UniProtKB/Swiss-Prot annotation:
Gene this chain is encoded by: INO80
Species name: Kluyveromyces lactis (strain ATCC 8585 / CBS 2359 / DSM 70799 / NBRC 1267 / NRRL Y-1140 / WM37) (Yeast)
Annotated Polar residues bias: 122-142, 149-162, 179-190, 268-289
Position of sequence motif DEAQ box: 881-884
The protein's name in its UniProt record: Chromatin-remodeling ATPase INO80
Keywords, in A-Z order: Activator, ATP-binding, DNA damage, DNA repair, DNA-binding, Hydrolase, Nucleotide-binding, Nucleus, Transcription, Transcription regulation
Catalytic activity: ATP + H2O = ADP + phosphate + H(+)
Assembly: Component of the INO80 chromatin-remodeling complex.
Domain-related comment: The DBINO region is involved in binding to DNA.
Basic residues compositional bias, start-end: 164-177
Primary location recorded for the protein, binned into one broad class: nucleus
UniProt superkingdom: Eukaryota
Localization of this protein: Nucleus
């Protein structure tokens, strides 16, 4: 059994205590962290608020700052400085005192340890006296002026016992604990180590009474005074080998800590502490425990003096009364004592938790008294100092030393609980303890002895039973020692009685029911009460938390308000001073910074200027070096192939003269070939002559590499064993005649081009044939292939790569000009191309006249997709038609074709420059990679100067332009039409400017208002290339272009029709019917009206009750003069005149108007007379009277009798012209919102009404007379059935509508409005009428296929014959469309897409080109218009370009002109005058909305 169990209470389970402490530690750690964060936030908030107020006040005071105020401010600043100096002195004094204390501590530590057998009490007393002396010295050195150190002026009256105790304590001074600490202040009991009590014994003094001090001390808001000795309660952890000196060291350290905090402490008299402690009565929140009661008794013992003896006598009496074993209430008292012990242990646990919380306290704030804990919070803290056998040795020694000091007191108070005295103690040899057990501990000890005795007896019985079982070789189960063995029968207890099975079962059932009833009562009665108690505890706890937090917040606010008022004036002055000083220093720093930046900027600009000068000089030398090497190479090649002579007189004379005046040219054949890297040359130090020599060596090396490459290609072919004449013996000048196998006659300039191409092939150099479109680049390239086959017996393989639209054109041209060539058309799907690849064998095939193919014609798409197959072939010659397709050096086409293995490459393009100089460099690098290897250098040479000249009309460097022409001449041949074709006249270009219509202007304005970036950015995007502009801006440009073309590109006009309030009948499946289906009248109104039978019978149907029949008789019989019964003589006369019998008169009177008209048309004599006139059959009828027939009159009556209205059209020519010109243009001014058939009327249970209604609505004779009979039915009646014409039923008697617009309520969109809503379409409509009259044929180019759809509707409305070609047209369809246009002159208009129909096709049948909208690239439009303006054109070509004034199209046109100017400068060397004619269409103010 542990020492703690014997001295105090039983120890709880260690595992439960560990879990409990861990949970509380985590919970309180979170609370402390939250409190720290909240405290930091409040401090930051208050300091920020103070700083803000301080700056505001300084700003306000700065406005009113005068001379007096400035002097006053300086005085205050001096005063503050002096205070700060005094504070520094005080701090230095404090540090000196602490240093002295530490020196004294070091002296104490250096003393020898306590020897064995020495008196521990004397050592402790001497140490305590030294510490007290040091404290007294430290307190005496401190200045009394320092705040926080106050001595007690008066000493309260004390009892003799108290005075004696204070004298026995050696005059200990009480030191104040720091006020900002939030830890609970704890005090020791009188029995917890009064080290000074031993001093009186040694001095022979009387034994003092047990010293009692309150355990909880209330710390006031002003000052918190505690005894310095209370710091000894701090827990210390020492090693097991520690000695008594370690304990003294702990006490000294605690004293030092108290001395360091001395400026914030003041002593408090013991009387004030006692009186404060008396007021702390136990409450509900802090119940009175045995420890607290004992402390209460100790405190009372200090003031009451001799009352302790009476109290002890009472306790002894109680002990004697309780200690008797015969007391019947012992068990109840033991249970109560156990409850008391458990409560005390719980309180000790709570005290330990609170001690841990104190260790995790929030950061301390000096001078912050407002947040000091209240007494209620402090009173809950319990001191827990438990020492057991397992505790460290220093703690056990300390506890034993305290016990020894207590035992030295002569008379100890009798206690209710266990008392322990240490009789003698030696740390190494002896420990003698006298323990007096009383009350609870005696009973527990007795129970413990009885339990041990029972266990011993049980173990002995078990051992004895096991021994007996071993003897009998049986192992009976050990009997349970504490339980009573009951006799059991039939698995039921008998309770020591003889009972039957039935009785036992009844007793067991009664027991079970009683057991269950007890548990039910407990669950029903106690569970709710426990739950309510738990909820009540939680609610009370929450209320306490809320109250505490509200009080804390209230105290914090009160503290802030108080401090705010005190510092307000100081903040105002400080703010003004800060503002003035900050403004002054900011201004000063800004001026210095500006001066420094200015100086740095000037230095940087000067350095940059010098660097630019050096770089310009270096770049000029580098440019001169590169150009010199290129010019030498170009001059050498040009002298061999004579490009200048072939081009004719198209170049500028000034450039030619400047070229003639050039310095002497170096002969590359005599110059050593060596390559010098440009990056390794230092252009700043090398001289010009050396650079010129290195340039000549590089040019010679490039020439040698080119020739070696061609020679190597030829040698590889020779190694294959093919016998041909591919290697000419010399490189001399060759004059070539037209090849014999060429089935055409070349013109003079085309023959010159053939010579140039042949010379290029002989030199092994690639070239660009850039003749203007329409000069026969195709036939020249075909002629050079024929030349190779005719002269050198080189039959291939040749490859021609062309756009998809010209594939068939190339096949046709090669077949027509060189029939001996076998052509392989390589296009189609994957399976078709796989079959075509069987025509060549890359290993053993020799290309001669009998080869499977000579020329392969394919497209750029096929080259990219089947590059893996085509790259393995060794092509003799590659021709790229429309080479602007590889204008981008980053495209896959360019990279794939560059990797092909071929001897020579020829590029065919009419526009080598479309947008910028980069495209020209891509073509040059493709044919000569060794010379034109850097685009950046090429751009520095030419691009920037020429493009800036075209854009801003700056001065052009003629020397640079001359050098560009010198570089390009050997590789490019270009002729224009006016220099080589005198029979082909210049085309006329006309820009037609139109104004926006009202609807277009509104849409354009709406789009401009919705653009966020501004309309100027849109116009800039329209002026730039589509590949370089922002894609979003390009999309907006397209929207504006749609408005300019036609508003219906956004939204088409809808077909309008009224709401049909009708139900239609549903028919069966029409698949089983014939060509014609009879459909009955099935349209019915959704409204049905039931006419009452009585009304119908009495008012409508004649009978005896009404006079309907009588009135009809009077109207149609009695009062009718034409009735035979009334006037027979008149009827007889009329019958003679009209050839009508009286009976017929009577019949006609009974009929309605429709039946009369039908009978008149069906009259046999009348029809016979009509048809005899119509069909020239003569008079075949007999008449007793003379009848004069007016043939013209009868012809008008017969106009509806012929099928197809042939006779009607012949008879109504004047009226039809009048109607077409005037009446057909009239449209209804009103369109009903709804339409419906008549309301259905029914009479219930009346068959007469149903029959009459059916007869009136569906009379066959009336229906056939009002409608027309189809032609097929008429043919069947006359031819197949043989019915005479005169017996055919009468038809088309219904009156016709005013015009087609009045035939139906359905309103179709007006085509006239469709035309007038677009300014371009309106102008085009007028232009086409003029061109149709003058017998022109027109090509109309579009950028948008949707606009082509609208144009087809317009052409259909105007009945113009037209065909269409766009990107969706197949290759076969394109060939057929071009053939139809060239061979069928009745086709008036050809609609084409600029991208699809502007490349490589011949449309010379047209003499007029109209651009409905222009392309971004002007060369695309040039190629499109040259489809008609080319060889074979015999008529004057006119080009119209439709533009909208003041819109984005004008900006695009200006940019296109700049690009054209770049082409003119590069190709021709000078700007060409603009010969375009501009026609402005004046704005019509009468345009319809």
């Amino acid at each position: 059994m542990s020492l703690e169990k014997l001295l105090n209470r039983e120890e709880n389970d260690s595992s439960k205590r560990t879990d409990f402490m861990g949970r509380w530690y985590l919970k309180m750690s979170k609370i402390c962290e939250r409190d720290d964060r909240e405290m930091d936030y409040q401090n930051w908030k208050f300091l920020s608020y103070q700083e803000f107020e301080l700056i505001n006040e300084w700003n306000q005071q700065g406005k009113e700052l005068t001379k007096d105020n400035c002097e006053r401010l300086l005085v205050n600043m001096d005063k503050t400085h002096k205070e700060w100096v005094e504070y520094q002195k005080f701090k230095e004094q404090k540090d000196a005192i602490i240093a002295e204390l530490k020196e004294s501590i070091q002296i104490i530590k250096q003393e020898p340890s306590i020897p064995s057998g020495a008196d521990a009490n004397s050592v402790v007393s001497s140490d305590t006296e030294q510490i007290q002396d040091s404290e007294t010295t430290a307190n005496s050195k401190k200045s009394p002026a320092i705040n926080g150190i106050k001595t007690s002026g008066k000493s309260p009256t004390k009892s003799p016992a108290t005075n004696g105790r204070r004298r026995g304590a050696g005059g200990n001074r009480r030191v104040k604990r720091p006020s900002n600490l939030s830890k609970t202040v704890r005090s020791r009991n009188a029995t917890d180590g009064d080290e000074n009590g031993n001093e009186n014994i040694e001095n022979g003094g009387t034994t003092p009474k047990r010293r009692s001090r309150p355990k909880k001390i209330l710390v006031s808001n002003v000052s918190k005074d505690v005894d310095a000795e209370e710091e000894d309660d701090i827990h210390t952890e020492k090693d097991a080998s520690g000695s008594a000196a370690d304990l003294d060291k702990d006490i000294v350290d605690e004293s030092i800590n108290d001395s360091e905090n001395a400026p914030r402490k003041r002593p408090v008299s013991s009387t004030s502490l006692l009186s404060r402690n008396k007021s702390n009565k136990p409450t509900k929140s802090s119940p009175l425990t045995p420890d607290s009661a004992r402390e209460k008794e100790n405190v009372n013992g200090v003031t009451e003096g001799n009352e302790d003896m009476d109290h002890d006598s009472v306790l002894d009496a109680d002990d004697s009364a309780i200690g008797s074993d015969d007391n019947p209430n012992d068990e109840q008292e033991e249970a109560d004592d156990e409850n008391v012990d458990e409560e005390a242990e719980d309180e000790n646990d709570e005290a330990e938790v609170e001690d841990d919380i104190d260790d995790l306290g929030a950061p301390e704030d000096d001078g912050d008294d407002d947040f000091a804990p209240s007494y209620s919070a402090i009173s809950k803290v319990k001191v827990n100092k438990k020492v057991n056998i397992d505790s460290p040795m220093p703690a056990i020694q300390k506890e034993l030393r305290k016990m020894a000091i207590k035992s030295s007191v002569a008379k100890a108070m009798k206690r209710k609980f266990t008392n322990c005295k240490v009789i003698s103690y030696s740390p190494e040899s002896q420990l003698e303890i006298k323990i007096t057990l009383k009350q609870l501990h005696i009973r527990k000890y007795k129970r413990h002895l009885a339990e041990e005795e029972r266990k011993r007896k049980a173990e002995e019985a078990l051992i004895k039973a096991e021994e007996e079982a071993k003897k009998r070789k049986l192992a009976p189960p050990p009997p349970p020692p504490p339980q009573q063995v009951r006799r059991v029968e039939h698995d039921l207890p008998t309770y020591g009685m003889k009972i039957t099975l039935k009785e036992a079962r009844a007793i067991q059932r009664h027991y079970d029911q009683t057991y269950i009833t007890i548990w039910k009562d407990m669950a029903r009665r106690d569970s709710g009460r426990i739950s309510r108690q738990l909820q009540q505890i939680q609610s009370i706890r929450g209320q306490n938390f809320r109250k505490t937090s509200s009080l804390c917040a209230k105290e914090a606010r009160r503290w802030q308000m108080r401090n705010f008022r005190q510092v307000k004036d100081f903040q105002t002055r400080a703010r003004r001073g800060i503002r003035e000083m900050s403004s002054f220093w900011k201004k000063n720093e800004r001026e210095e910074r500006e001066m420094k930046k200015k100086a740095e900027k000037e230095a940087i600009e000067q350095a940059k200027k010098e660097e630019e000068q050096r770089e310009n000089l270096r770049a000029a030398k580098k440019l001169n070096f590169l150009l010199t090497q290129t010019e030498l190479y170009s001059h050498f090649i040009g002298s061999k192939i004579k490009t200048n002579e072939l081009e004719g007189t198209m170049t500028d004379d000034s450039l030619t003269s400047m070229s003639n005046n050039k310095n002497k040219v170096v002969d590359l054949t005599k110059t050593a070939a060596s390559k010098t890297n440009v990056e390794s040359i230092d252009f700043a130090t090398e001289d010009d002559e050396k650079l010129r020599l290195m340039a000549a060596q590089n040019a010679s090396n490039a020439l040698k590499e080119t020739q070696d490459k061609a020679r190597k290609f030829d040698e590889e072919d020779e190694e294959d064993g093919e016998l041909n004449f591919q290697n000419p013996t010399s490189l001399g000048e060759i004059t070539i005649d037209q090849p014999k196998m060429l089935a055409c006659t070349l013109k003079e300039y085309q023959l010159k081009g053939l010579n140039w191409l042949a010379n290029l092939y002989d030199q092994g150099i690639n070239g660009i044939l850039a003749d203007e479109m329409g000069l026969g680049k195709t036939v020249q390239s075909i002629s050079v292939l024929a030349h190779l086959a005719d002269r050198y017996n080189i039959w291939g393989p040749f490859i021609v790569v062309t756009p998809a639209s010209t594939l068939h054109n190339w096949v046709n041209e090669i077949s027509r000009f060189v029939p001996q060539f076998k052509i392989l058309p390589y296009w189609g799907n994957a399976n078709d191309r796989k079959t075509l690849r069987k025509f060549w064998d890359r290993k053993h095939l020799r290309y001669g006249r009998d080869a499977p193919f000579h020329v392969m014609v394919t497209s750029y798409q096929m080259v990219v997709s089947d590059a893996s197959y085509l790259q393995k072939m060794k092509w003799q010659y590659m021709i790229l038609d429309e080479a602007q397709a590889i204008k981008s050096s980053q495209s896959s086409r360019w990279k794939t074709l560059l990797s092909f293995h071929c001897r020579n490459r020829l590029l065919l393009t009419g526009t080598p420059i479309q947008n910028n100089m980069q495209e020209l460099w891509a073509l040059l690098h493709f044919i000569m990679p060794s010379l034109f290897d850097s685009h950046d250098e090429f751009s520095d040479w030419f691009s920037k100067d020429i493009e800036s000249h075209a854009e801003s009309n700056t001065e052009l460097n003629q020397e640079q332009l001359r050098r560009l022409h010198m570089v390009l001449k050997p590789f490019m041949l270009r002729r224009i039409k006016k220099n080589v074709q005198s029979e082909l006249g210049d085309k006329i270009e006309i820009d037609v400017l139109c104004d926006l219509t009202f609807r277009q202007a509104k849409l354009y304005q709406v789009l401009k208002s919705q653009v966020s970036g501004g309309y100027d950015a849109i116009e800039n995007a329209a002026g730039n290339d589509d590949v370089t502009s922002d894609q979003k801006l390009v999309n907006l440009v397209m929207e504006f272009r749609k408005v300019c073309n036609h508003p219906d590109l956004f939204e088409r006009a809808d077909v309008m029709s009224p709401f049909s309030f009708v139900s239609f009948g549903e028919s069966a499946s029409l698949s089983r019917e014939g060509d014609f289906v009879e459909v009955n009248y099935s349209a019915k109104n959704l409204i049905n009206y039931n006419l009452p039978r009585l009304i119908y019978d009495e008012l409508v149907v004649p009978n005896y009750n009404n006079d309907v029949d009588v009135r009809a008789k009077l109207l149609y019989h009695t009062m009718n003069i034409f009735h035979p019964a009334n006037s027979f003589q008149l009827c007889f006369i009329l019958s003679k005149l009209t050839d009508t019998s009286p009976n017929k008169f009577a019949t006609l009177l009974e009929q309605n108007v429709i039946n009369r008209a039908i009978d008149l048309q069906n009259d046999g004599y009348f029809n016979t007379a009509k048809y005899s006139i119509a069909y020239d059959e003569g008079e075949k009828i007999f008449s007793s009277n003379l009848l004069i027939n007016d043939k013209l009159k009868y012809l008008h009556l017969l106009k509806n009798s012929t099928s197809g209205s042939v006779l009607k059209n012949l008879l109504e020519i004047p009226s039809s012209v009048y109607e077409n010109e005037y009446f057909n243009s009239i449209s209804p001014a009103y369109h009903p919102a709804a339409s419906a058939p008549p309301i259905n009327i029914d009479v219930l249970a009346s068959n007469n009404f149903v029959q009459k209604k059916q007869y009136e609505m569906f009379n066959p004779s009336i229906s056939s007379a009002l409608s027309s009979i189809p032609s097929s039915v008429q043919h069947k009646l006359i031819v197949e059935k043989g019915i005479p014409i005169e017996e055919l039923p009468v038809t088309e008697m219904a009156p016709k509508a005013f015009n087609n617009s009045f035939t139906s309520y359905i309103e179709m969109p007006s085509m006239d409005r469709f035309i007038t809503e677009s300014a371009k379409l309106k102008k085009l409509d007028e232009l086409l009428v003029k061109l149709k009259e003058e017998d022109h044929r027109v090509l109309i180019y579009f950028q948008m296929t949707k606009m082509m759809d609208l144009m087809e509707e317009y052409l259909t409305y105007r009945q113009y014959t037209h065909i269409r070609l766009d990107g969706s047209s197949k290759l076969d369809d394109r060939r057929d469309l071009v053939h139809d246009w060239q061979t069928k002159p009745d086709i008036f208009i050809f609609l084409l897409s600029t991208r699809a129909g502007g490349l490589g096709i011949n449309l010379t049948a047209a003499d007029t080109v109209i651009f409905y909208d222009s392309d971004w690239n002007p060369t695309i439009d040039s190629q499109a218009m040259d489809r008609a303006h080319r060889l074979g054109q015999t008529r004057q070509v006119t080009v119209y370009r439709l533009l909208i004034r003041g819109t984005i199209e004008e900006r695009m046109r200006d940019r296109a002109k700049q690009k054209e100017h770049v082409q003119q400068v590069v190709m021709e060397g000078k700007a060409k005058e603009n010969k375009q004619k501009i026609i402005e269409v004046e704005k019509e103010h009468s345009e319809s909305a």
